[in-house]
UniProtKB/Swiss-Prot annotation:
Source taxonomy: Bacteria, Bacillati, Bacillota, Bacilli, Lactobacillales
An example molecular function term from Gene Ontology annotations: phosphatidylglycerol-prolipoprotein diacylglyceryl transferase activity
Keyword match Transmembrane helix: yes
Membrane topology: Multi-pass membrane protein
Top-level lineage group: Bacteria
Gene this protein is translated from: lgt
InterPro entries for this protein: Lgt
Keywords: Cell membrane, Membrane, Transferase, Transmembrane, Transmembrane helix
Protein name: Phosphatidylglycerol--prolipoprotein diacylglyceryl transferase
Source organism: Streptococcus mutans serotype c (strain ATCC 700610 / UA159)
UniProt GO cellular component terms: plasma membrane
Length: 259
């Protein structure tokens, strides 16, 4: 089993979980700043947004997780702020981040759709990297299986949980997000292919569809009615993404994304 603590300096413990999140954040910021000038967005605007949105997104991701596991946290309220042990939900972070983006864009007089288009690829890459924090923490895994011989030894050993090998759903989602990142980076460079906003809407469809399938393999995620909470949200993302693309394709006044 991999030690979740990567570096220990006296009382300070730096966890792999945190390293994965921060690494993803740094790369996302770099990619966004590099693309932002094409939409007349200043790098200072990107950095200011991150300084506001990132901590709020972490809080939103934690609150989302706590709300849907309220019975446990009602009995263990001291566990609510202990996010370094895991237990943050990406959908909570995304919803919070999107809300902050719309408010921030309004006050900075930036088109929200432009900000979404330049930031989306970085978000996909950050999510791909962040899932490896779940790997180290032995969370976001799937059903028990008899063997995982197709995987490298270090993954196979880490996926041996409670006496069984577990389906590495963290890996599936990480690779799915990485593939989506590569595809959207290629499509975004093709002239007159994507309209403004369709980078972000592609993300809704791609991530939502992949997450719906992968979430069905998990055993540790939150349930609501007959589906997992994340599956309900995944369906919503896909439907919204498809509707928005259809609407924009029918509106010939909407320009194409400028490479």
């Amino acid at each position: 089993m991999i030690n979740p603590i990567a570096i220990k300096l006296g009382p300070l413990a730096i966890r792999w979980y945190s390293i994965c999140i921060v690494t993803g954040l740094i790369l996302a910021v770099y990619l966004t700043i590099r693309e932002a000038p094409k939409k007349n967005i200043k790098s200072d605007d990107v950095l200011d947004f991150i300084l506001i949105a990132f901590p709020l997104a972490i809080v939103g991701a934690r609150l989302y997780y706590v709300i849907f596991d309220w019975d446990y946290y009602l009995k263990n309220p001291s566990e609510i702020p202990v996010i370094w042990h895991g237990g943050i939900a990406i959908y909570g972070g995304l919803l919070t981040g999107a809300l902050v983006l719309f408010i921030f864009s309004y006050y900075r007089m930036i088109k929200p759709i432009d900000f979404l288009d330049v930031a989306t690829p970085g978000v996909m890459l950050a999510q791909s990297i962040g899932r490896w924090g779940n790997f180290v923490n032995q969370e976001a895994y799937g059903k028990a299986v008899t063997q995982l011989n197709y995987l490298p030894d270090f993954i196979r050993k880490q996926m041996y949980i409670d006496g069984h090998y577990r389906t590495p759903t963290f890996l599936y989602e990480s690779l799915w997000n990485l593939l989506g990142f590569i595809i959207i980076m290629i499509l975004r460079r093709r002239p007159n292919l994507l309209k403004e906003g369709e980078v972000a809407f592609f993300y809704l469809i791609w991530y939502g569809s992949g997450r719906f399938v992968i979430e069905g393999m998990r055993t540790d995620s939150l349930m609501f009615a007959s589906l997992r909470v994340s599956q309900w949200l995944s369906v919503l993302l896909v439907v919204v993404g498809v509707i928005l693309i259809v609407i924009r394709r029918r509106n010939h006044a909407i320009p194409y994304y400028q490479c």
